[in-house]
Amino acid sequence: FKMRGINCTIPHKIAVMQYLDEISESAQLIGAVNTIVNTDGRLYGDNTDGKGFMMSLESNGIDVKGKRIVILGAGGAARAICVELALAGAAHITIVSRPGPKNLGPSLLEILQTRTSVDAETNDWVGTYKIPAGTDIVVNATSVGLYPSVDAIPNFDLDSLTRDMFVQDVIPNPTETALIKELRRRGIRCETGAGMLINQAALNIEMWTGRKPDKTVMYRALEEALA
């Protein structure tokens, strides 16, 4: 293994873990790694998806400690995000997922309840979901709105959002989803998924090289690639 490090994605995020010498706490909880660092032949695995998400919140002045958070979706992105939110001191996490045999909400809830100190619950996503009053942060961790279905918006009640809530999308393509456009039209504070993508990539580069990359250049490259 002569590379300084690599990124990996599905289906290798889980399979590669057995070959690593050390795995970060969050990656162990998530059950997947997306980056590997080679230090003198010792392989270290981490998951920077959730960390990139947290950096996106921080860049908007959002501190998750003590906050009540609703996560739309229970897949891989939701798992990484929920673990980082729990480790950062979120007060309450509500996982909203479709009921059925493929529902990953219960297994994610079990991880949060047994391996972190966060208060958490699941809600079945049946029909139009209403965001509970008192929610601080809403996260769209679904793929609804991802290219090419650029006009789609997750089925939740936009009127249940208030101006003191913050909404974070995880979809990077398009860089401004139909959901983000509608939220901005309504005056709801929000952030696109591009920040999460750029931040996790920047973290990976820094882990491999010890240098912080210019994220402005990375944003520009992403916009050009998706234009």
Residue map of PLM features:
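Phosphate/diphosphate ligand-binding glycine-rich loop within oxidoreductases
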Residues: 1-60
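Conserved S-adenosyl-L-methionine
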Residues: 87-92, 185-189
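NAD(P)-binding Rossmann-fold cofactor-contacting core
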Residues: 90-116
